[in-house]
Amino acid sequence: MVLNQEQFDAFRMEIATFGNIPILSQYCGIGCVFCKVHTDSYLGHYPKIPPIDREDLLKGFEYTNPNVNYVRLGAGVLVAPHTDPFLHPKIYDFIKIASEHFPTKKITTVTTGAYIREDKMDFLNSIPNFGIDLSLITMQEQREKIIPRSERERTMYLLKYAPLNKCTLMFTGNLDEVKKDLELLHKLEVNKRVRQILVRRVEHTATSQPRLKELSQACIDKYEECISWVKQNYPDVVFTVPILKDVFRGGNNEYFIDADQRIARQRDIISSLPEGTFVNLICPFSGYDYFTRAFMGMPNVKTNLIENHLYGGSVSVAGLLNHQDIRAQFNPDRNDVMIVPEEMYNIDGLDLLGEHKTLLETYYNAKIILG
């Protein structure tokens, strides 16, 4: 093993929490404008991961979720979020090892494709349970502005010949570009070879670089229009749901299903509390209005909007909130019990900045329930 204890703890946490196996921390150098490494200083909280070896990989397999049907090799959410798996000198060996270790699971690598070797296509295509999650972004005029080292020709080669599991487009705020990208993918019959074509929204935080803020705001302003067109013209294309609004039904409907199930669980929790207990629900922007309507008839329950200033890009119902943002924005008049999203905490029970929920309970002198 090459990982020391601190590195292995971070490695283990990323796998067990998010399902990603981070195999190295080398900065990819592609320069994507939306890369978090440029602005998110909290990522320094986690140690860098040297290129792992076979023993590290096999040990990491022990922390994968047995209930999911995939294994992702490469970058993580918090650990090594700015790399490309194909920078690892043993990546092709690792793909083969993972495919044989998990013969019933899909082995995937999330990548822009910039470092994939074309002479390895036959090898990759020979592995029946492997597929690339290709972050295509866009193939239109803005590509080089968003991905300075875009490797356009290599990307086109991958679209034609690589084993693809998923192809992700990033809406840039220009509907014509999405139309052209989807036309291209269907012309190449990528839609027949992938499990999913995904259209997603760009996100930013207060600390993001100006170019990203400009791109992201243009995307946010016109995302509803984009999705309305996609649903009508390409009903099989999936899209991310940044806010629980009816216009976004029909894409990743699991967001709405998860929200309704979460609301039911929260109602059960609230009904089990002593009469008169005042409950504050901590809600991210994505679900605040939806949850507010759901609890409107309960006078002992208040929904509280917490904007995500620390970490951008989360579109889940719970969001990836953190203690820092909660303390800065949540100042209740009454607070017996707080219900916070369980997704705030990693497998070790710590938030993004390494704080346990007991610290928040002490700060607010209130009981915290995950739900």
How would you label these PLM feature ranges?
Residues 1-11, 250-371:
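Radical SAM enzyme core and accessory elements
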Residues 39-56, 64-116, 128-155, 166-175, ...:
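Core AdoMet radical
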Residues 139-141, 158-185, 197-216, 246, ...:
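Conserved strand-turn element in the central/C-terminal portion of the radical SAM core barrel
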Residues 5-56:
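Canonical Radical SAM [4Fe-4S] cluster-binding loop centered on the CxxxCxxC motif
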Residues 209-261:
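Helix-enriched interaction subdomains in cytosolic or periplasmic regions
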Residues 50-60, 87-96, 148-157, 178-186, ...:
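Well-ordered, non-membrane alpha-helical segments in soluble/globular domains
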Residues 53-65, 115-127, 156, 182-193, ...:
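Short amphipathic alpha-helices and their capping/turn segments at secondary-structure boundaries
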Residues 110-114, 171-174, 241-244, 281-287, ...:
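Structural motif
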